[in-house]
């Protein structure tokens, strides 16, 4: 997305929001950090006009963490109300579903960054979001692994995929999934 399209989206949101004061903008999909200059430009633009329109913007960003560095973490901590960190759990699970462009896994690269970011936010206003698939129906182990890494805010959700995909969840998987949720509730 270009900065101009982003500005038009902010203008549309302000106009369509009527008398609502609090507005939320979430940066996600693809990888927002690949277009970080545009993210910053949109935040700056929204901040520059929010008082004029009696609005209060809250921003959230979702990232796979590959491009996170200290400068970006500092910006996120100052400008993003919430941050969603994509991690699917155990190393072998995450690396299977989230390989880097060259095919190598991302786990070893992102986990220390995610831990640093979560700690810099005092373990609040973030969450680690995992996706479970047919490949890791034992996802309660992934939740426990993420907790063992020190994360306090954890969410896992089922994959949404074409049923023909080998990682898609099927109706036959549901009893196992229900059991995993029961195990987490204990």
Residue ranges with predicted function:
Residues 3-26, 35-161:
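Radical SAM/AdoMet-radical enzyme domain recognition
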Residues 33, 100-104, 168-175:
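Charge-dense, low-complexity intrinsically disordered segments
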Residues 29-30:
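Short acidic donor-binding/metal-coordinating loop in glycosyltransferase active sites
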